[in-house]
From Swiss-Prot:
<feature type="region of interest" description="Disordered">
    <location>
        <begin position="316"/>
        <end position="373"/>
    </location>
</feature>
<dbReference type="InterPro" id="IPR001810">
    <property type="entry name" value="F-box_dom"/>
</dbReference>
<comment type="function">
    <text>Substrate-recognition component of the SCF (SKP1-CUL1-F-box protein)-type E3 ubiquitin ligase complex.</text>
</comment>
<dbReference type="InterPro" id="IPR036047">
    <property type="entry name" value="F-box-like_dom_sf"/>
</dbReference>
<feature type="region of interest" description="Disordered">
    <location>
        <begin position="239"/>
        <end position="275"/>
    </location>
</feature>
<dbReference type="InterPro" id="IPR039594">
    <property type="entry name" value="FBXO34/46"/>
</dbReference>
<dbReference type="Pfam" id="PF00646">
    <property type="entry name" value="F-box"/>
</dbReference>
<keyword id="KW-0833">Ubl conjugation pathway</keyword>
<protein>
    <recommendedName>
        <fullName>F-box only protein 34</fullName>
    </recommendedName>
</protein>
<feature type="domain" description="F-box">
    <location>
        <begin position="556"/>
        <end position="608"/>
    </location>
</feature>
<comment type="subunit">
    <text>Directly interacts with SKP1 and CUL1.</text>
</comment>
<feature type="region of interest" description="Disordered">
    <location>
        <begin position="472"/>
        <end position="524"/>
    </location>
</feature>
Length: 695
């Protein structure tokens, strides 16, 4: 029984409310269009207040329900203009208390995601004398906080102007000091330097941080140039030994001062409209922070050690390439006899090793002719040119280290002469650095220019030479490399050192390469002769024993020479086990067995063509041409007669399966056709549903 529907009376203050009952009744098309137009007309004044809003001030559309903080607008009624902020707060609180009796208060503070926010949309237009018929920009402006998704772009012009001023200042400077403070101090100083700051109420952006860092670098430029003018080139070793404390370094390296300059020049040379390379500045800042951290904790290992070594490697390579051109004059002032000799590595150790005394190898001064080295070069010196009694202290060189220091108790005479010549030039150029004694070991390695490039790569030794060379023969193999007469030292030492330098540039293991041709003709002929005599030192018993073993391991080719008909006759006399072994070991025999269908002498497979396709009753396998599998040739003394068809042979009864003489799981198709004609009709009826017993 359905109730009769009646029209619901509506007030004039609620023109937008349409009950569910009215929706069920038939409505004309024009009335529906007018309702949509009316709804659109009431939603428009929420965006732009107009005269229609003043006329229908009592009507409250849906759009005015969201704000929590009220603000003044131009389209208010005179009653609303007379109210101040306190009156608004009183009305707001009164609305909250008034909602206890009827519907929930519309102007209560609605949190995001609260259910009251949905209810407030339907309960709003019942309170006609409520304030706030205007749209407020943000509904979350409580306690005077700034809007979440709005950015103040007014101060961006000030930042750009200040950034251009910093670029103009940096274009005039030539060097910059490493940054003393990190990013965490950047915002504090930047806010305190200027009175109000660029943006005093919010954190600084990356562009402002970069501008601040450039300003700091310019301010500290004068002190850096004073300290760096008189200091010589000191190459700082990135990875230091753990047990040895490093010596203090009073002067900063000029390579580190020149490196930011080389990176800032392309920045300042650009047009002022382009943005700053923030990645370059941040990478430079991180490298400097890590450098200062390494100076505070010199010997400690931290998680940033690998990153610190990589940053130091980049700084050293760039700085050494820049300082290489300015230091060519000091390198050319050496002895003219050393022009073909190129120094490969100049090592510097900040402390003296325990194996050596300070007085033997300590000189006051540093080298001015430090060549530019790639960061991935690792040098391994060959110790064959030294005496057996010499002690060698080596510092291991990894890929991240820039240089490797080698110290020797006694060097060859020609190398000592060159070291003394270079030390004279070194001490003349740097008299200021005599304050800190440094232990320097200079390894002079020479490379001959006209040497073929094929000898530079490491040659593979002959096979078997590792067992024939002993330690005594190794010392006799290079007698000419160590002993040279005094008058020939100036001439013959250069090709000799060329051979040593080529071996020093290569990475070598503990075993020494026996056939490394030297530059001198006398040494090369002696090495070739000694390498030829190494093969004659093997005993005759060893050669005879090895020949006998090789003869035993060689396959015998007698069977392969026989014709096929003879091989087939031989195979038919073999048992199944022997034939299966021959088939598995040789492909030639396998092809013969399968092609000629050779059966073993003790095979139990039925040769009758009627049962050729009949499978085994238990393993369900059919006979294949040349099949010698072990599961089909055992004798089956017992016959299992089935009532519905032919029986089959089996190796044992089910009760005898546990006996050791039983051949478990080995069956063939040699079955007995007992009562075959008698049980044919029964066999046809039960063929589809028969289940055979498996023993």
């Amino acid at each position: 029984m359905h109730l009769k529907l009646y029209w619901k009376l509506q007030k004039k203050e609620r023109p937008l409310e349409v009950s569910r009952d009215t929706l069920r009744t038939p409505m004309s098309h024009g009335k529906a269009n007018g309702d949509v137009k009316a709804r659109a007309s009431y939603m428009k004044p929420t965006v732009l207040p107009s005269a229609s809003l003043v006329k229908a001030s009592s009507r409250k559309p849906f759009g005015i329900l969201s704000p929590n903080v009220l603000c003044s607008m131009s389209g208010k009624s005179p009653v609303e203009n007379s109210l101040n902020v306190k009156a608004k707060k009183n009305v707001l609180s009164a609305a909250v208390h008034q909602s206890e009796e009827g519907l929930p208060g519309t102007w209560a503070i609605v949190k995001p995601g609260n259910t009251k926010e949905k209810i407030a949309f339907f309960a709003a237009h019942q309170y006609s004398n409520r304030i706030g018929s205007m749209k407020i920009k943000s509904s979350w402006d409580i306690d005077g906080r700034a809007t979440k998704r709005r950015k103040k772009s007014g101060d961006l012009k000030k930042a750009k102007l200040q950034l251009e001023m910093m670029r103009e200042i940096n274009s005039q400077c030539y060097q910059s000091e490493p940054f003393v403070c990190g990013v965490e101090h950047c915002s504090v100083h930047y806010m305190s330097d200027s009175g109000d700051g660029v943006c005093a109420a919010r954190p600084l952006s990356v562009i402002q941080m970069v501008a601040f860092l450039e300003q700091k670098a310019t301010a500290l430029l004068a002190s850096c140039t004073k300290n760096c003018t008189n200091s010589p080139a000191i190459v700082k070793i990135s990875g230091q030994s753990r047990g040895i404390p490093p010596a203090p370094e009073p002067f900063s390296a000029p390579e580190t001062c020149e490196e930011p300059k080389e990176q800032e020049n392309p920045e300042t040379g650009r047009s002022q409209g382009e943005p700053v390379r923030v990645l370059d500045m941040v990478a430079r800042l991180e490298s400097e922070c890590l450098k200062h951290q390494g100076q505070r904790e010199p010997g400690s290992l931290s998680r940033n050690n690998s990153f610190r070594r990589n940053v130091g490697r980049v700084l050293l390579t760039n700085g050494s390439q820049a300082s290489d051109k300015s230091e060519e004059g000091s390198a050319d002032t050496a002895d003219p006899q050393e022009n073909p000799l190129q120094p490969v590595s100049v090592g510097e150790e900040p402390s003296v090793t325990e194996h050596h005394s300070v007085g033997e190898q300590a000189w006051d001064g540093t080298s001015q002719s430090c060549p530019s080295l790639p960061a991935t070069v690792s040098f391994h010196m060959d110790s064959t040119d030294l005496e057996p009694g010499q002690q060698t202290a080596m510092k291991s060189c990894s890929r991240d280290d820039v240089e490797m220091v080698e110290e020797f108790d006694e060097l060859p005479t020609d190398a000592v002469r060159r070291i003394r010549r270079e030390l004279v030039t070194v001490t003349k150029h740097s008299p200021e650095q005599r304050q800190d004694p440094l232990c320097i070991s200079i390894t002079v390695c020479t490379v001959e220019k006209d040497r073929p490039a094929a000898l530079d790569s490491l040659e593979e030794p002959l096979p078997g030479m590792l067992f024939f060379l002993s330690s005594g023969q190794d010392q006799q193999a290079h007698p000419q490399l160590r002993e040279h007469p005094a008058p020939e030292a100036s001439e013959a030492s250069q090709p000799q050192d060329a051979a040593e330098g080529s071996s020093a540039g290569e990475e070598k293991d503990a075993s020494v390469e026996p056939l490394l041709p030297a530059a001198s003709p006398g040494g090369s002929t002696s090495q070739v002769l000694e390498a030829a005599t190494c093969k004659k030192q093997v005993s005759q018993d060893f050669l005879e024993t090895r020949f006998k073993i090789q003869q035993l391991l060689e396959p015998q080719q007698y069977m392969a020479c026989l014709p096929h008909h003879i091989i087939v006759k031989i195979f038919r006399l073999l048992p199944t086990l022997s034939l299966a072994i021959l088939k598995c070991t040789c492909r030639y025999f396998k092809s013969i067995i399968e092609y000629y269908n050779i059966r073993p002498a003790d095979s139990r497979w039925v040769r009758d063509p009627r049962y050729r396709e009949d499978p085994c009753k238990q393993c369900k396998k059919k006979y294949v041409k040349g099949d010698v599998s072990l599961c089909r040739w055992h004798p089956k003394p017992y016959c299992q007669a089935l009532p519905y068809g032919p029986g089959y042979w089996m190796c044992c009864h089910q009760s005898q399966k546990g006996f050791p003489g039983c051949k478990l799981g080995l069956h063939d198709n040699h079955w007995l056709p007992a009562c075959h004609s008698f049980n044919r009709a029964i066999h046809k009826k039960t063929r589809g549903s028969e289940t055979e017993e498996e023993y």
